[in-house]
From Swiss-Prot:
Pfam family, one: Pribosyltran_N
InterPro entries cross-referenced by the UniProt entry: Pribosyltran_N, PRibTrfase_dom, PRTase-like, Rib-P_diPkinase
Function field: Seems to play a negative regulatory role in 5-phosphoribose 1-diphosphate synthesis.
Residues with Phosphoserine modification: S219, S227, S233
Family annotation (CDD domains): PRTases_typeI
Protein's name in the database: Phosphoribosyl pyrophosphate synthase-associated protein 2
Lineage: Eukaryota, Metazoa, Chordata, Craniata, Vertebrata
GN (gene name): PRPSAP2
Organism: Pongo abelii (Sumatran orangutan)
């Protein structure tokens, strides 16, 4: 596993341990690896807690040590059973609140339901609902990483520190891709062009954007709402009004804006889940002359058949961080590589507990990062 260790963090972390408790809210042992890494870096023991499912599938949490007057950090990595994971977190937060914890900080590297942060058709903004539930349960602070949309921070009425994984991914490119200076950074849709531009500018590389039929459906901003069918006897609008309507969208044939011929193509995005759009992008880049294709993403959800499809595709390597456990997927697909980001989460916890500034973790980060 690739790990970045800045020189200033190589020594043992200076942390006041007396008032800090570190919990993992996961009942699934495979989801506790990140928590263990963070605890080891901080030099503290994991707090004693039992999280389990009753025979009737209800979640039960039993905290087995005092949290009164302490800073409680609850680490929750998202498993495949996302709804159970959320309930585990909410119940543990509420248990700490009713046990008189001084502060309750959620460490949620991948914020669930973040894709549902926009209104579509007659749906709802689920990430806003989840933010309200967390605050109501008793969360006083949130540490997360690379939110799908930065505006999600505004859904909370508590402080939110949205850390970035890009420094770790950039260093991976520089150290693990020998000929990276012959690479081009690729956005698989116009929606991810800003992220690609940020990577390209920092690596002093060119950029290419894929536009057309291979676009991800999320880039379509149409909300999709339609009125109920008209009653024939009732006019839709007053006959004297002429309201202009939007012309329907029509995606052009697939196009790559930028030169990728004879180069390494590095596709960057924040989430890799359903891989169809990545596979289509890889095929297009191969047709345009790219001789090697990498995919870099912060959150590797890699749902359903994603590992098998990646293994059979034109993609040479997929690099994701360990915000979400994916050890099983790595066994299915050797092309998947992991970058460890426990270092930055540990440092964020240390700084918040010690009352230090968080600005060090956000230096050189712009609005588009």
């Amino acid at each position: 596993m690739f790990c970045v260790t800045p020189p200033e963090l190589e020594t043992k972390m200076n942390i006041t341990k007396g008032g800090l408790v570190l919990f993992s809210a996961n009942s699934n042992s495979s989801c506790m690896e990140l928590s263990k890494k963070i605890a080891e870096r901080l030099g503290v023991e994991m707090g004693k807690v039992q999280v389990y499912q009753e025979p009737n599938r209800e979640t039960r949490v039993q905290i087995q040590e005092s949290v009164r007057g302490k800073d409680v950090f609850i680490i929750q990595t998202i498993s495949k059973d996302v709804n159970t994971t959320i309930m585990e977190l909410l119940i543990m937060v509420y248990a700490c609140k009713t046990s008189c914890a001084k502060s309750i900080i959620g460490v949620i590297p991948y914020f669930p339901y973040s894709k549902q942060c926009k209104m579509r058709k007659r749906g709802s903004i689920v990430s806003k609902l989840l933010a309200s539930m967390m605050c109501k349960a008793g969360l006083t602070h949130l540490i997360t990483m690379d939110l799908h949309q930065k505006e999600i921070q505004g859904f909370f009425n508590i402080p939110v520190d949205n850390l970035r994984a890009s420094p770790f991914l950039l260093q991976y490119i520089q150290e693990e891709i020998p000929d990276y200076r012959n690479a081009v950074i690729v956005a698989k849709s116009p929606a991810s062009a800003k992220r690609a531009q940020s990577f390209a500018e920092r690596l002093r590389l060119g950029i290419a954007v894929i536009h057309g039929e291979a676009q991800d459906a999320e880039s379509d901003l149409v909300d999709g709402r339609h009125s109920p069918p008209m009653v024939r006897s009732v006019a839709a609008i007053h006959p004297s009004l002429e309201i202009p309507m939007l012309i329907p969208k029509e995606k052009p044939p697939i196009t790559v804006v930028g030169d990728v011929g004879g180069r390494i193509a590095i596709i960057v995005d924040d989430i890799i889940d359903d891989v169809d759009s990545f596979l289509a992008a890889a095929e297009t880049l191969k047709e345009r002359g790219a001789y090697k294709i990498f995919v870099m993403a912060t959150h590797g959800l890699l749902s359903s058949d994603a590992p098998r499809l990646i293994e059979e595709s034109a993609i040479d390597e997929v690099v994701v961080t360990n915000t979400i456990p994916h050890e099983v997927q790595k066994l299915q697909c050797p092309k998947i590589k992991t970058v460890d980001i426990s270092m930055i989460l540990s440092e964020a916890i240390r700084r918040i507990h010690n009352g230090e500034s968080m600005s060090y973790l956000f230096r050189n980060i712009g609005l588009d990062d």
